């Protein structure tokens, strides 16, 4: 591989086992990190606001829960796993006052460091450990003696051993069993945002909705359009997930593959590629981050409007009716109430 990859033999759990880790947040990643750290012999405290609904769950799982400020004061290593938009205030109010020399500040995503929303003091280590999978998978793989690949990055190495500490943390949550890839805060943040906006979320959702619209506007039944443009997408993505695009093409019919090869580049053409480059440029320049922070601080008016418009799209009502016919699909509470 062209990147540096670390495994179990490259990481020393001893670098973290003698120190206290505060996990700030107890959502998808927070619970997986905390429980796996504990099971790896690391002293863990959880930082949650007094009124957090996650406090009872963490306590039931045998973890000691403090306020974020109390956890930051007690810990040697502080892992922030709160949402991006909550991190700056959380850091300023609860963590910064207790971030004394020699401590380490860790992140699961580089957004706030990359865009200067958080500026740690120069006498602390700053690193990132980012599992490339949801928290439930991170935890399940750890319990099964396996692991989820992680990204690791060091932004600030005050101690001279920040990378070693980050690798020890990754090992404690199972990452080095699978492999830990070295990156930077900038690379992780920019590629993560681009993937979300241009491909995984924004690109895929827009492609599916537009395909549905083209078929229904041409007079085809919404139910059939839903199957062809959304439902069957999972079959294709699963094949890609298992073996890449080549595996998908090997597995589909020759008719489907010919249509893929001959028509796909007409849909996603050079103009689309240029617009994708423009999206990347907004990420690299900080334009997107500034826009999103301002939107959040203004109460998210555009976000709320766009979310409501998406929920009202005809594909949602059609999909709800069709999913009711599929006993194998776990339907959300909003569709089963």
Swiss-Prot record:
Binding site for Mg(2+) 2: 192, 228, 232
Record field: catalytic activity: (2R)-2,3-dihydroxy-3-methylbutanoate + NADP(+) = (2S)-2-acetolactate + NADPH + H(+); (2R,3R)-2,3-dihydroxy-3-methylpentanoate + NADP(+) = (S)-2-ethyl-2-hydroxy-3-oxobutanoate + NADPH + H(+)
Official protein name in the record: Ketol-acid reductoisomerase (NADP(+))
Function description: Involved in the biosynthesis of branched-chain amino acids (BCAA). Catalyzes an alkyl-migration followed by a ketol-acid reduction of (S)-2-acetolactate (S2AL) to yield (R)-2,3-dihydroxy-isovalerate. In the isomerase reaction, S2AL is rearranged via a Mg-dependent methyl migration to produce 3-hydroxy-3-methyl-2-ketobutyrate (HMKB). In the reductase reaction, this 2-ketoacid undergoes a metal-dependent reduction by NADPH to yield (R)-2,3-dihydroxy-isovalerate.
Cofactor note text: Binds 2 magnesium ions per subunit.
Enzyme class, UniProt record, top EC level: oxidoreductase
Domain of life: Bacteria
One GO term describing the cellular component: cytosol
Residue ranges occupied by any KARI C-terminal knotted domain in the UniProt entry: 184-329
Pfam families: KARI_C (PF01450), KARI_N (PF07991)
Residues of the KARI N-terminal Rossmann domain: 3-183
Encoding gene (name): ilvC
UniProt xrefs under InterPro entries: 6-PGluconate_DH-like_C_sf, KARI, KARI_C, KARI_N, KARI_prok, NAD(P)-bd_dom_sf
UniProt family annotation: Belongs to the ketol-acid reductoisomerase family.
Residues given in the record as Mg(2+) 1 binding sites: 192, 196
Annotated binding of substrate, by residue: 253
Gene3D superfamilies per UniProt: 6.10.240.10, NAD(P)-binding Rossmann-like Domain
TM region(s), chain numbering: none
């Amino acid at each position: 591989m062209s990147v540096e990859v670390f495994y179990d033999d490259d990481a020393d759990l001893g670098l973290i086992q003698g120190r206290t880790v505060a996990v700030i947040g107890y959502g998808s990643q927070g619970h997986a990190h905390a429980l796996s750290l504990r099971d790896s012999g690391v002293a863990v405290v959880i930082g949650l606001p007094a009124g957090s609904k996650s406090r009872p769950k963490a306590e039931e799982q045998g973890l000691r829960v403090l306020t974020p400020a109390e956890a930051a004061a007690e810990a040697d290593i502080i892992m922030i796993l709160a949402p991006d938009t909550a991190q700056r205030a959380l850091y300023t109010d609860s963590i910064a006052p207790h971030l004394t020399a020699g401590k380490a500040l860790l992140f699961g995503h580089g957004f706030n460091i990359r865009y200067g929303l958080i500026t740690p003091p120069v006498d602390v280590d700053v690193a990132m450990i980012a599992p490339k999978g949801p928290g439930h998978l991170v935890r399940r793989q750890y319990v099964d003696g396996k692991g989820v690949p992680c990204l690791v990055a060091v932004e600030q190495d005050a101690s001279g051993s920040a990378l070693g500490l980050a690798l020890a943390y990754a090992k404690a949550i199972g990452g080095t069993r699978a492999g830990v890839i070295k990156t930077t805060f900038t690379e992780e943040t920019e590629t993560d945002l681009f993937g979300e906006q241009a491909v995984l979320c924004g690109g895929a959702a827009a492609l599916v909705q537009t395909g549905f619209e083209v078929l229904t506007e041409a007079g085809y039944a919404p139910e059939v359009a839903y199957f062809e443009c959304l439902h069957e997408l999972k079959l294709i993505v699963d094949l890609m997930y298992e073996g890449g695009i080549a595996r998908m093409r090997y597995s589909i019919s020759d008719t489907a593959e010919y249509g893929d090869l001959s028509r796909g580049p007409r849909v996603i053409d050079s103009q689309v590629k240029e617009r994708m480059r423009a999206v990347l440029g907004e990420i690299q320049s900080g334009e997107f981050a500034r826009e999103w922070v301002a939107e959040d601080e203004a109460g998210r008016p555009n976000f709320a409007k766009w979310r409501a418009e998406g929920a009202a799209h005809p594909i949602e009502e059609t999909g709800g009716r069709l999913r009711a016919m599929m006993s194998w699909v776990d339907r959300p509470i909003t569709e089963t109430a």
